[in-house]
Design a protein with these regions (language model features):
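Redox- and metal-dependent alpha/beta enzyme cores, enriched for Fe-S-associated oxidoreductases
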Residues: 1-11, 160-163
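Short internal beta-strands
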Residues: 4-9, 70-73, 243-246
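Conserved catalytic cysteine-centered active-site region
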Residues: 6-20, 181, 212
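Glycine-rich, acidic loop regions that bind phosphate or pyrophosphate groups
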Residues: 11-121
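Short, basic, glycine/proline-bearing loop/turn elements
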Residues: 15-26, 44-46, 133-141, 186-191, ...
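Redox-cofactor binding/interface segments in oxidoreductases and associated redox assembly factors
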Residues: 45-46, 71, 167, 217, ...
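Active-site diphosphate/adenylate-binding microenvironment
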Residues: 123-207
């Protein structure tokens, strides 16, 4: 078809190769921003039931008027649940797509030239998007404090295309996803439920579930406070999990949401109660050491990738703290 492919706005994983030229990226989590991404299209083919999850409220629908929605899901309860559809079909997604592809193949073959042109155009667009991201990260690379954009790029660069990632770091997850470049559909996992504390124990479970293979757990400092005992389990089981704590010393996503509400008492008083994780700051190196996990702090952006590469290569549980800016 040559159609662009978007991921769910709040994914449990990324079930499409991020290296594919038709991959655009995950949708945002606000309805108005999703609509902005989709407004150029005539139709959407939604696979599964939770493609357009919105987290923070904005006016209007995530699906712009005039766009036809076709939906395929294995669960009938998903169909038409959050937006009207022109056609909804119940069926196993893999089996259904296999049949659809066989039906599409002769149609694509008869339009081979147009299809090839679409693929080439998509590849050029993807290359341009990645180049813009790289340039933006380069511009911030030598700043006094590592920015979320730079941290996301350097983490993705160090991890590469084959190591499993368990992500629970809201400050950097969008940037990390933008730099992923893998043919795998199983590399990246995320907590769809949204509750804090999932990431570190999930990474331990992932490693156990894939024959004790290396896993990188990326976690925000706030989320890390909910289940740090996962460090002890990783040490006890001698699992090759590299825990990367991106530390902005605040519940950043909550603070930003509060700041976006101009009528809130917090904004009027410029006081965000219980949002700052300071006084005292958490000593993650001491916390890791208390549970038998070696740890290091990386202050310079240039040292992030080498530190993560060394952590993965060590074959033992380890923790890397990366102080980052709030924006």
């Amino acid at each position: 078809m040559g159609a662009p492919v978007y991921g769910s706005s709040w994914p449990a994983h990324i079930p499409f190769p991020t290296s594919h030229p038709l991959w655009i990226g995950n949708l945002p989590t606000r309805a108005n921003e999703i609509a902005q991404n989709l407004k150029a299209y005539d139709a959407i083919f939604a696979l599964g039931g939770k493609s357009l999850i919105t987290i923070l409220y904005t006016e209007g629908s995530a699906v712009p008027s005039g766009i036809e929605v076709f939906q395929l899901s294995a669960d009938a309860r998903d169909l038409g649940r959050t937006y009207p559809t022109k056609l909804s079909v119940v069926g196993d997604i893999r089996a259904s797509l296999t049949v659809l592809l066989s039906l599409l193949a002769p149609k694509i073959a008869s339009r081979a030239e147009a299809y090839t042109a679409l693929r080439k155009h998509a590849a050029r667009d993807q290359e341009a998007r990645r180049a813009r991201l790289m340039a933006a990260a380069d511009a911030e690379f030598t700043g006094p404090v590592t920015t979320p954009l730079v941290a996301g790029r350097e983490m993705a660069r160090a991890i590469g295309p084959n190591i499993a990632i368990v992500d629970e770091a809201p400050a950097t997850l969008g940037h990390l996803r933008a730099f992923l470049n893998t043919s795998s559909t199983h590399q990246y996992s995320f907590s769809r439920g949204g509750a804090l504390g999932w990431g570190m124990p999930a990474a331990v479970g992932f490693s156990l579930g894939i024959d004790r293979a290396p896993v990188v757990s990326i976690v925000g400092d706030g989320a890390a406070l909910y289940s740090p005992q996962a460090l002890w389990t990783a040490a006890h089981e001698k699992l090759p999990v590299t825990f990367v704590v991106v530390n902005n010393r605040e519940y950043n996503i909550l603070k930003k949401y509060m700041a976006s509400q101009p009528r809130s008492a917090s904004v009027r008083a410029n006081r965000f109660i219980a949002m700052d994780i300071v006084d005292p700051a958490i000593d993650f190196l001491a916390l890791a050491a208390s549970m038998g996990v070696p740890a290091r702090r990386v202050e310079r952006a240039a040292d992030i990738a080498p530190a993560i590469e060394a952590g993965i290569a060590s074959g033992v549980p380890n923790l890397i703290e990366i102080p980052i800016s709030a924006t």
